[in-house]
Regions:
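A structural motif corresponding to the C-terminal end of an alpha-helix
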Residues: 89-95, 151-163, 231-234, 258-269
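Short, solvent-exposed amphipathic alpha-helical segments in soluble enzyme
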Residues: 114-116, 142, 184
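Glycine-enriched alpha-helix->loop->beta-strand junction motifs that scaffold or abut catalytic
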Residues: 117-121, 162, 188-192
């Protein structure tokens, strides 16, 4: 868990049918459905705001998470470059960062990330939900194909960047049969560790997800939702931390056991240590008064 994060964008072009962040668009008076995917908000001021925060005398260093809400490497980043500018600020200050993404555009920033990783300042998590390209196209319509994301894991790992494969989300009765195969593919690509999160359906996500499920997989819809209710005490979602992320009950325990067994066998059960915070610095700027002591 992280106590601080930034998001260079609100909304996400990836259009994942299951995205738990969709309700955040409702706070802006926009729909969590199509608006979330098409009416995007870029934050070009983010790098300057970040630099100002890091220069504050009140600031205390801790790993900064990027991508915990919306993907910083969605297609819009290719033209805007806000994420890269944020990384440049973090590199200049030698500040630790952990990134979560499905976007292969992160390869563009390997030059910065490899330099930071060599100092123990950067780590990446790449989410692979399924290895089935057809299912991925339906469920994550504008996300790079699973094989392409695995290639990104390989390139990051080869550059010395500690990378975790994230099976996120696990969809009951739809993607759960692939759990071991996804982990094996991640290990083969060079992932250093692995994690998983169960499908979450907060607020407006639930009706959007159910509509998608009925359209694309009507024969499995009842079973998918029954499994979710089984894990959440009869409800489709629980906001309690542990139940929200992993669920409870026999099925949730089975998924956890399968994951743990496969991760151990593949060497992905490592606990990654903390990133370094002792290298943090505030670079001098033109006009700063230099200390004589």
């Amino acid at each position: 868990p992280f106590d601080r994060s930034i998001n260079p964008y609100r909304g996400c072009e990836h259009g994942c049918s299951y995205c738990f962040a969709r309700p955040t668009h409702a706070y802006l008076g926009l729909s969590p459905g199509l608006d979330f995917e098409t009416r995007l908000i870029a934050r070009p001021e983010a790098p300057a705001v970040l630099a100002r925060e890091l220069r504050s005398k009140r600031y205390r260093v801790a790993t900064l998470a990027i991508g915990t809400n919306t993907d910083p490497y969605q297609p819009l980043e290719r033209d805007r470059g806000i994420m890269r500018a944020c990384l440049e600020v973090l590199r200049e200050h030698r500040h630790p960062v952990a990134i979560v993404t499905k976007g292969t555009l992160i390869e563009r920033d390997i030059d910065i990330l490899s330099e930071m990783a060599a100092m123990g300042l950067a780590r990446v998590g790449v989410s692979v939900t399924t290895l089935d390209a057809d299912l991925s196209r339906r469920m994550e319509p504008r996300v790079p194909a699973p094989k392409r994301r695995l290639a990104t894991i390989r390139r990051l790992a080869e550059a010395g960047i500690e990378t975790r494969i994230m099976v996120s989300p696990v969809v009951p009765a739809l993607t759960d049969p692939e759990l071991e195969a996804i982990l094996a593919a991640g290990a083969e690509a060079g992932a250093a560790a692995a994690s998983w999160i169960m499908l979450r359906l907060p607020l407006e996500v639930a009706p959007l997800w159910k509509a998608w499920l009925e359209e694309h997989y009507p024969g499995r819809a009842g079973r998918v939702m029954a499994r979710l209710r089984e894990m959440h005490g009869g409800a489709e979602y629980s906001a309690q931390w542990h139940r929200r992320m992993r669920g409870e009950g026999q099925y949730a325990q089975l998924i956890a056991q399968r994951f743990d067994k496969a991760a151990r066998r593949l060497g992905l059960d490592r606990t990654l240590g903390p990133l370094r915070s002792d290298l943090f610095r505030v670079p001098a700027r033109a006009g700063d008064q230099l200390s004589l002591f």
